[in-house]
């Protein structure tokens, strides 16, 4: 007999993958799984999957050689957040273009997007609530 444990509000998932586009699929899979366990709709799950992929695509060009992408996923019973981060090339600022199409996609698919450019670390924090924006 098996018992499925529901994800609770204090559960977080942290992972690190090489800063390579081939590994963004791992981040997409994790966010989709967490959203499904929180009973997000299929459309909301797809929105999160695409948003995490876009966040990774925005960050990868700023990653230093041999860098890794770190991701922390968590939230509450009715929302999810994902923080995706890279270490930028030393001496290079990690400025992201907030007028780009990728940024537009991020803001359209999530409820909030926060950019943190602290030192040599560049991160995006995405948040999406279940049932938000008329879903």
Spell out what each predicted region is:
Residues 1-47, 94:
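Bergerat-fold GHKL ATPase/HATPase_c domain
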Residues 1-14, 58-135:
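Conserved beta-strand-loop-beta-strand hairpin that lines the nucleotide-binding pocket
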Residues 42-65:
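Conserved ATP-binding N-box helix of the HATPase_c
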Residues 30, 39-40, 51, 70, ...:
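Small/flexible residues
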